[in-house]
């Protein structure tokens, strides 16, 4: 509490002495007003807009006669401490002050802030009227609102408190309130505040004292009218005034009278800020009245006031002090509470300070169980309802028990807090100790020469990494320059980290480190055969590479490109090659890549810059001659960040990759010993310069015999191992595999075949676990129970080929396929011949054909007309009739020139009315003069013909060499004819065919069509 002192000037003492104590004349009201204003003016803070008011009496100070202001210590034994204001025993009407979290207990103080304007105005008026009393009650809900609209929102029992100090901050009031006793709400009071009256001021002049005073006009009085009458000594109503002997205070009677005059006057506070002390008892409120009904009869007010009327002032009554006896139970509870308080203070020093603030001098807590209960409740942080229960409890033993319960909870909380604090402190202490020891160890090592500075250690580490490597001289020069630069940089700078990362990459590369290759042909052959079936071309090329390396005595790099349909083993054969050559394997895909920096790296100036994939490969494999697989090279992208396919030109050029320059390293790196293998499905999308740098090796699709062998040797054992089955659980017959390949897995690769085999084995494993049996044979009869309905029913749409229909052969990225060319005569109604598309001899084409195939159809029509004219001059069918040409399936895009001879044959068959041989299929491009030109995909087309059950093939004569390279298990049983002109094709296709009587025969109904699953495929079938 702050101590304030009001010094009264000697002149005022003289005035008080001559005017009051000598009884020369009654003191004038103007002089009283002057004394009052003078004392208040001395109390104001310099320039502060705060109103601080305290309500104390005072005791005489013998030193200088000043009035001493001090904190309320609630003790009368020390004469040097100020005495407290005498609090009235009964105060029926008090402003209601609602508390949120915990109640205020008697004899304890609390700082309260109020921001509601209505409550602030009420408290200001009460303080100005010297009525600094409030009723403090706990709210039932934890709301933020300060203004109560219903008495049911607060608990009925609270405390009567005195505003000991008040600070007016403008937007809120900050008060120090001290509780005195328990009170109970009996009703609500509505306050009527009259409006302020205008005050007329007048000036009084006292020449004797050289004083001019501004006072209200009604206060200007004379001895007869306005002066306050002084009662005689004999008047019984006159209140006796306490006198202090002169010998005790050492002051003059006049000084004491002046001080007492200032003390006893009822001073009203100024309108602004100020500090007022008064020892006189405040008068009972006169401006308040209880709300009465309109009839004029007074009636009690209910506890619940209307919600529209805010509860500002309540009518209260004192709660009687409970009577108790000092029983053994009370003594035991008291001692236990004191012991618990002692334990809490011992564990948490913060409670010691709180307790010292709560306790008063010379106050024995042990002697007062009521105060002890309130003390324990104030120290604890219990729930508001629990604290309110202690406040309302009237039975002292029960109140002690409740307070003890809260203190025990607080003690346990303090123990837990102490435990957590010890653990955290111990952890921090260990970390700090470890840090100090590490720093000391660094200093000791540095002094002994065991450890060098960080920069020196970094340099030694890099030189140690280059110890067993053959670093080129140009590279070593760059490393030395960077190490020198590193020594001059601050370790916390960004350039230091950039240089350090750069040195990390330079020293991590395998300069001159080469792995020992396997140059044994037998071992390499065994490794390749163990992993893959067939692929003789690839295996032969790898063995040639080993043979050349063996003769030269050194290894070299090569650039190979495996292209073929998906699932034929392009990626897996690369792993086998790496194992056969004893080289490290590294794979990265360039499918969809659009950033050149992925291959050649980023510039070091960029944040997070890294080298390209090839430098990362060398760092990971730690050798200069790994096998690098560049997957999906035909699907490489192109964007605004550059063209990665152009960046591959330097990488895949044997003449340039010996000095490959990465953007990040910016030093030449030798990649000439790296074996590059690229994979692609088609080579048409690969740029010509890049394709020219690679050695292309075609990987064709598998025929049924190859698929069966792969399934028996590789797929089934691996799938059974993965599912935990053995041969005693499952047996897949040869018929089941044939049906699986023919009806479910017709693609060129074996990836789909692997999925179906795994599906069958998983279902068998499920049945084994369910104990439905121990052995499950899989054959053609029960295969549908494992895989469902067949996807492909037949490759042939017609059992007997009708007139105008011929089977052709196509090649796709998925392998070979057979398809039909259908032609038919269009019947044009009258009136439609004016359409240019329906002129005589027109050709209507459908089937989702590309431009190349449409041009091929027009060429075929011209060749067919010329050939038919030479064969049957009188046959004008192709010149006069409207022809419709269709290539199923309509949803599948088709393009390419290789269907030329097939379209001519279909048109000739339609014009002559002769069907072709039933077991024939053909492919070949035709020129305008009827010459048959070579096509590609002979192996795939031959496989498709065998799959469709065709026995006779017509191929261009220039493709004879391609057919002769095919394995015998593909060509066995086939009747193959090689045509030079279309006349050769006609002789083979219409051999031993009897002419029909009609010149135009409509198509027969197809025997079987592909199922919906096969028809849903949308791959492009280019006739190459």
Curated annotation (Swiss-Prot):
Q: Where in the cell is it found?
A: Mitochondrion matrix
Keywords assigned by UniProt, alphabetized: ATP-binding, DNA-binding, Hydrolase, Mitochondrion, Nucleotide-binding, Protease, Serine protease, Transit peptide
Provide the E.C. number(s) assigned to this enzyme.
3.4.21.53
- Could you cite one Gene Ontology molecular function of this protein? serine hydrolase activity
GO term, biological process aspect, one: chaperone-mediated protein complex assembly
The highest taxon in the source lineage is Eukaryota
Q: Which InterPro entries match?
A: AAA+_ATPase, ATPase_AAA_core, Lon_bac/euk-typ, Lon_lid, Lon_proteolytic, Lon_Prtase, Lon_prtase_N, Lon_prtase_N_sf
Region Disordered, as annotated, extends over 219-305, 999-1024
The protein's annotated catalytic reaction(s) are: Hydrolysis of proteins in presence of ATP
Q: Could you give one GO CC term from the UniProt record?
A: mitochondrial matrix
Pfam families, A to Z = AAA (PF00004), Lon_C (PF05362), Lon_lid (PF22667), LON_substr_bdg (PF02190)
Q: What outcome follows a substitution of residue 898 to A?
A: Severe retardation of TFAM degradation following mtDNA depletion
Main location (coarse class): mitochondrion
Residue ranges with Basic and acidic residues bias = 285-297
Q: List each copy of the Lon N-terminal domain by range.
A: 94-411
Residues the record lists as binding ATP = 564-571
In this chain the Lon proteolytic domain maps to: 800-992
Q: Could you name the active-site residues?
A: 898, 941
Transit peptide residues according to the UniProt entry: 1-56
Is Protease a UniProt keyword of this protein? yes
Q: Which NCBIfam families match?
A: lon (TIGR00763)
Its biological purpose = ATP-dependent serine protease that mediates the selective degradation of misfolded, unassembled or oxidatively damaged polypeptides as well as certain short-lived regulatory proteins in the mitochondrial matrix. May also have a chaperone function in the assembly of inner membrane protein complexes. Participates in the regulation of mitochondrial gene expression and in the maintenance of the integrity of the mitochondrial genome. Binds to mitochondrial DNA in a site-specific manner.
Q: How does it assemble?
A: Homohexamer or homoheptamer. Organized in a ring with a central cavity.
Family the UniProt entry places it in: Belongs to the peptidase S16 family.
- Supply the name of the protein: Lon protease homolog, mitochondrial
Question: What is the gene name?
Answer: Lon
């Amino acid at each position: 509490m702050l101590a304030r002192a009001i010094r009264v000037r000697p002149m005022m003492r003289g005035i008080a002495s001559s005017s009051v104590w000598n009884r020369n004349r009654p003191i004038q009201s103007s002089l009283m007003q002057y004394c009052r204003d003078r004392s208040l003016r001395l109390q104001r803070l310099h320039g502060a807009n705060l109103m601080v008011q305290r309500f104390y009496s005072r005791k005489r100070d013998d030193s200088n006669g000043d009035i001493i202001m001090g904190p309320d210590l609630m003790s009368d034994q020390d004469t040097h401490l100020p005495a407290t204001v005498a609090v009235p025993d009964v105060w029926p009407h008090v402003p209601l002050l609602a508390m949120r979290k915990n109640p205020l207990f008697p004899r304890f103080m609390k700082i309260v802030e109020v921001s509601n304007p209505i409550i602030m105005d009420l408290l200001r008026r009460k303080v100005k009227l010297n009525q600094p009393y409030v009723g403090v009650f706990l709210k039932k809900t934890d709301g933020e609102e300060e203004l109560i609209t219903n008495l049911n929102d607060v608990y009925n029992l609270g405390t009567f408190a005195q505003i000991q100090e008040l600070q007016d901050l403008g937007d809120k009031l900050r008060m120090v309130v001290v509780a005195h006793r328990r009170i109970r709400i009996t009703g609500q009071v509505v306050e009527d505040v009259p409006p302020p009256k205008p005050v007329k001021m007048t000036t009084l002049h006292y020449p004797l004292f050289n004083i001019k005073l501004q006072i209200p006009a009604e206060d200007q009085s004379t001895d007869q009218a306005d002066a306050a009458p002084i009662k005689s000594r004999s008047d019984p109503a006159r209140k006796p005034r306490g006198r202090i002997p002169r010998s005790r205070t050492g002051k003059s009677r006049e000084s004491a009278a002046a001080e007492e005059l200032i003390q006893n006057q009822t001073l009203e506070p100024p309108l602004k800020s100020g500090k007022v002390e008064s020892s006189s008892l405040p008068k009972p409120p006169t401006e308040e009245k209880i709300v009465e009904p309109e009839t004029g009869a007074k009636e009690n007010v209910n506890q619940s006031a209307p919600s529209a009327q805010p509860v500002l002032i309540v009518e209260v009554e004192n709660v009687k002090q409970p009577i108790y006896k000092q029983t053994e139970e009370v003594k035991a509870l008291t001692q236990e509470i004191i012991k618990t308080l002692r334990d809490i203070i011992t564990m948490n020093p913060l409670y010691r300070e709180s307790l010292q603030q709560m306790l008063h001098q010379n106050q024995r807590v042990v002697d007062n169980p009521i105060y002890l209960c309130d003390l324990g409740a104030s120290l604890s942080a219990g729930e508001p309802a629990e604290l309110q229960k202690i406040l309302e409890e009237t039975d002292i033993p029960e109140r002690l028990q409740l307070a003890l319960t809260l203190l025990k909870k607080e003690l346990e909380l303090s123990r837990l807090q102490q435990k957590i604090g010890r653990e955290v402190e111990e952890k921090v202490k260990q970390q700090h100790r470890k840090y100090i020891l590490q720093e000391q160890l660094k200093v000791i090592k540095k002094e002994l020469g065991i450890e060098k500075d960080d920069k020196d250690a970094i340099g030694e580490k890099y030189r140690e990494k280059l110890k067993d490597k053959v670093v080129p001289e140009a590279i070593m020069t760059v490393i030395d320059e960077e190490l020198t630069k590193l020594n001059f940089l601050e370790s916390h700078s960004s350039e230091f980290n950039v240089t350090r990362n750069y040195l990390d990459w330079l020293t991590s590369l395998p300069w001159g480190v080469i792995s020992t290759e396997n140059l044994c042909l037998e071992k390499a052959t065994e490794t390749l055969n163990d992993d893959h079936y067939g692929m003789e071309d690839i295996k032969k090329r790898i063995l040639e590479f080993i043979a050349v390396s063996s003769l030269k005595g050194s290894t070299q790099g090569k650039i190979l490109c495996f292209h073929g349909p998906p699932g034929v083993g392009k990626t897996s054969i690369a792993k086998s090659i790496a194992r056969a050559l004893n080289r490290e394997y590294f794979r990265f895909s360039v499918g969809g890549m659009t950033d050149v920096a992925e291959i050649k790296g980023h510039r070091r100036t960029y944040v997070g810059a890294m080298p390209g994939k090839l430098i990362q490969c060398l760092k990971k494999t730690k050798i200069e001659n790994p096998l690098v697989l560049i997957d999906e090279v035909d699907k490489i992208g192109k964007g605004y960040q550059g063209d990665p396919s152009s960046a591959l030109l330097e990488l895949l050029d044997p003449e340039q990759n010996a000095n490959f320059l990465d953007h990040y390293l910016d030093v030449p790196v030798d990649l000439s010993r790296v074996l590059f293998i690229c994979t692609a499905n088609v080579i048409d999308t690969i740029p010509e310069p890049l394709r020219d740098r690679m050695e292309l090796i075609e990987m064709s699709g598998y025929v049924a015999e190859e698929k069966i062998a792969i399934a028996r040797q590789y797929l089934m054992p691996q799938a059974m191992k993965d599912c935990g089955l053995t041969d005693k659980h499952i047996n897949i017959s040869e018929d089941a595999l044939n049906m699986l390949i023919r009806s479910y897995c017709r693609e060129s690769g074996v990836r789909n075949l692997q999925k179906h085999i795994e599906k069958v084995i998983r279902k068998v494993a499920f049945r084994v676990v369910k104990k439905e049996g121990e052995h499950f044979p899989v054959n053609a009869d029960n295969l549908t129970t494992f895989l469902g309905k067949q996807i492909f029913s037949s490759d042939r749409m017609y059992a007997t080929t009708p007139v105008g229909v011929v089977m052709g052969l196509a090649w796709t990225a998925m392998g070979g396929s057979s398809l039909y060319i259908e032609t038919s005569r269009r019947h044009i109604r009258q009136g439609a011949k004016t359409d240019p598309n329906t002129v005589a001899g027109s050709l209507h084409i459908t089937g989702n054909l590309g431009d190349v195939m449409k041009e091929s159809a027009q060429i075929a029509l011209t060749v067919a007309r010329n050939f038919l004219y030479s064969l049957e001059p009188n046959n004008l069918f192709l010149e006069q009739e409207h022809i419709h040409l269709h290539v199923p399936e309509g949803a599948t895009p088709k393009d390419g020139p290789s269907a030329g001879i097939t379209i001519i044959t279909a048109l000739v068959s339609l014009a002559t009315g002769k069907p072709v041989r039933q077991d024939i299929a053909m492919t070949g491009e035709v020129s305008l003069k009827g010459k048959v030109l070579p096509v590609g995909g002979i192996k795939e087309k031959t496989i498709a013909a065998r799959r469709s059950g065709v026995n006779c093939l017509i191929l261009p004569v220039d493709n004879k060499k391609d057919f002769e390279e095919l394995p015998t298990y593909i060509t066995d049983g086939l009747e193959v004819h090689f045509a030079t002109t279309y006349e050769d094709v006609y002789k083979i296709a219409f051999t031993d065919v009897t002419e029909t009587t009609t010149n135009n025969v409509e198509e027969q109904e197809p025997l079987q069509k592909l199922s919906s699953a096969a028809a849903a495929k949308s791959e492009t079938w280019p006739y190459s």
